[in-house]
UniProtKB/Swiss-Prot annotation:
Family per similarity comment: Belongs to the UPF0102 family.
InterPro entries, alphabetized: Restrct_endonuc-II-like (IPR011335), tRNA_endonuc-like_dom_sf (IPR011856), UPF0102_YraN-like (IPR003509)
Organism: Burkholderia vietnamiensis (strain G4 / LMG 22486) (Burkholderia cepacia (strain R1808))
Protein name: UPF0102 protein Bcep1808_0248
GO molecular function, one term: nucleic acid binding
Length: 142
């Protein structure tokens, strides 16, 4: 089964839907794509292989799907915030977001990776800094 180490609850709600740190839907998508590309390059430099990006499945979206050198599937949520206000980038992955990511990941895993272990990571960009949180949450967290 897909698993990861337990993590403390991130507290707070998902990021606001309207306005937010990066206003404008088109601009938000472009900004998001830029951060996802930077996260992908960062992870590839650390030995993970790219599998897929922006996979929409079962009502959720997987920002990045990577594969570790040991064959483990790594589902990566990419978040960006200009500052740590309201808890910052990592804390913005609230239980609702985790639930959507987990549902999509488990469906992807069943179709493409059953038999392989998997984990859920977060790459958080905040005030120009990148943090890679391995095993950020578990499939049974949400």
């Amino acid at each position: 089964m897909c698993h990861a180490a337990p993590a403390a609850p991130a507290g707070g709600r998902d990021a606001p839907r309207g306005g937010g740190e990066f206003s404008g839907a088109v601009r938000s998508r472009a900004v998001g794509a830029n951060f996802e590309q930077r996260a992908r390059q960062f992870l590839e430099r650390r030995g993970l292989a790219f599998v897929a990006a922006n996979v929409t499945i079962r009502g959720g979206e997987l920002d990045l799907v990577m594969r570790a050198s040991d064959g483990m599937l790594v589902f990566v949520e990419v978040r960006a915030r200009r500052s740590a206000r309201h808890g910052g980038a990592a804390a913005s992955v609230g239980w609702r977001k985790r639930r959507r990511v987990i549902a999509a990941a488990l469906d992807f895993w069943a179709r493409h990776g059953a038999g392989a272990a998997c984990r859920f990571d977060v790459v958080a960009f905040e005030a120009g800094r990148l943090d890679w949180l391995r095993d950020a949450f578990r499939a049974d967290d949400a």
